[in-house]
């Protein structure tokens, strides 16, 4: 009887351990319904008329992103309405661009080609391409081709990914040899250092995702399996706060969320290391309940809607079976390689006793160089959390001077620039900003009754 009870006890402990392991991995049922529901809310006011207006307003970046996002949601959910949306957006864009080439250019349209090519591929696989699409696709690519734009940041990698996809889709296009030459040049530019000179959280996730996609789609995955690139991946995993949040530094303010979940899941599959899956799970678990209303607000918000497609892409990744993981490091200074090839440069100071939730954590950007740098904030506290609550956090994009570091805003009594008025000037000078904290309800110290703590 005692033996049976002991066996039952071991069985129960084993079951609990297995459940705990699986609980720290994202499951499709956890995130895909939430992602598609959010996408639906944010595109609630979708109509063909609205799409045509967006195209004619030269909203190239988000029109192409919408056509690829809806196509990816179709692949993940098999819901025909997403394929219909992608086909309609793509078809209208092709027709309008064919009539007026000037509509092919818009703000931040370096994001456009890779999304356009992805939408084309999925529509082609489902026999949904309109007549004359090939000619417009090649013309679009040629109009956005700049062989001298070689840089190791998100703008460069987005362009490179677009031309990788165009080379695969149109191997006989007149300009394909030039496209391939550009793609090879872009790959070599960052691969010689096996690092990217980027210093902002969200932008780093964009170019990491692009580089992984480029490797997958141009048969270079084996080139990512080096010790240097493994350390590069781990650098971002180790930056994750114990709560699961990704601290923001450099020119950042977007709250890097869905894209990092996707990147961590891809890193897990490239390395076979389950710690990256745990990082994705932690970020989703802490992030989703705390997302701003803008991520769900019904209406028409293409930026936020398309952001959710990253989770739809997670659902399309190969099944991951590996359970072994490497430990997240505690207090350390991470290192990096810069664009000039200099190695072992101090990057981020990370202070924590463990990676368990609730542990106090501090991060300071020691590098503050490279793309999207905020050099005046070097050495300040970029992020500080206690009990999973961020107390110091990134202030705003383009908030670059020293006033924007080591600052906790407690109360805004005067809206005239205090201290970084949301819609006011970030260059407000010749004024000291002060405020007071009411400690009347706090505890008196024994030695100094006039002080409270």
Regions found by a protein language model. Give the residues of each.
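Bacterial N-terminal signal peptides that target proteins for export
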Residues: 2-10
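Bacterial N-terminal signal peptides
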Residues: 11-20
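N-terminal module of bacterial RNA polymerase sigma factors
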Residues: 40-42
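Substrate-binding/catalytic groove segments of enzymes
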Residues: 219-223, 246, 392
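Aromatic-lined, polymer-binding surfaces characteristic
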Residues: 44, 48-232, 240, 252-253, ...
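Catalytic and substrate-binding regions of extracellular carbohydrate-active enzymes
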Residues: 302-452
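Terminal, non-catalytic domain-edge segments
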Residues: 24-38, 231-235, 249-353
């Amino acid at each position: 009887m005692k033996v049976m009870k002991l066996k039952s006890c071991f069985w129960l402990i084993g079951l609990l351990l297995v459940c705990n392991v699986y609980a720290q991995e994202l499951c499709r049922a956890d995130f895909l319904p939430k992602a598609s529901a959010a996408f639906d809310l944010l595109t609630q006011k979708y109509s063909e008329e609205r799409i045509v207006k967006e195209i004619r307003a030269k909203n190239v970046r988000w029109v192409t992103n919408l056509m690829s996002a809806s196509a990816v949601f179709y692949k993940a959910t098999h819901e025909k309405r997403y394929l219909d949306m992608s086909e309609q957006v793509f078809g209208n864009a092709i027709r309008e661009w064919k009539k007026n080439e000037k509509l092919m250019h818009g703000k931040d349209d370096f994001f456009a080609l890779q999304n356009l090519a992805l939408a084309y591929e999925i529509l082609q696989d489902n026999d949904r391409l309109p007549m004359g699409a090939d000619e417009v696709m090649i013309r679009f690519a040629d109009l956005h081709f700049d062989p001298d734009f070689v840089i190791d940041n998100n703008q460069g990698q987005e362009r490179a990914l677009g031309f990788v996809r165009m080379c695969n889709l149109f191997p006989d296009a007149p300009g394909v040899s030039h496209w391939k030459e550009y793609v090879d040049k872009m790959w070599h530019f960052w691969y010689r250092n096996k690092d990217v000179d980027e210093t902002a959280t969200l932008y780093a996730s964009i170019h990491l995702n692009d580089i992984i996609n480029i490797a997958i789609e141009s048969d270079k995955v084996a080139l990512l399996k080096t010790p240097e690139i493994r350390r590069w991946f781990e650098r971002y995993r180790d930056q994750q706060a114990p709560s699961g949040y990704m601290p923001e530094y450099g020119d950042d303010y977007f709250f890097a969320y869905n894209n990092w979940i996707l990147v961590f899941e891809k890193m897990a599959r490239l390395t076979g290391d389950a710690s990256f899956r745990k990082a994705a799970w932690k970020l989703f678990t802490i992030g989703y309940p705390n997302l701003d209303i803008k991520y769900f607000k019904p209406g028409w918000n293409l930026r936020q809607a398309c952001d959710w497609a990253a989770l739809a892409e997670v659902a399309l990744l190969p099944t991951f079976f590996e359970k072994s993981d490497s430990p997240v490091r505690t207090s350390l200074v991470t290192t990096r390689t810069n664009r000039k090839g200099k190695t072992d440069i101090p990057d981020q100071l990370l202070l924590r006793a463990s990676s368990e939730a609730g542990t106090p954590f501090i991060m300071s950007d020691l590098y503050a160089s490279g793309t999207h740098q905020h050099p005046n904030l070097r050495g300040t506290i970029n992020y500080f959390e206690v009990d999973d609550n961020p107390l110091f956090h990134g202030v705003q994009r383009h908030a670059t001077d020293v006033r924007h570091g080591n600052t906790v805003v407690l109360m805004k009594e005067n809206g005239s620039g205090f201290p970084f008025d949301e819609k006011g000037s970030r260059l407000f000078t010749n004024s000291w900003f002060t405020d007071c904290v009411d400690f009347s309800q706090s505890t008196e110290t024994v030695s100094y009754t006039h002080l409270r703590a």
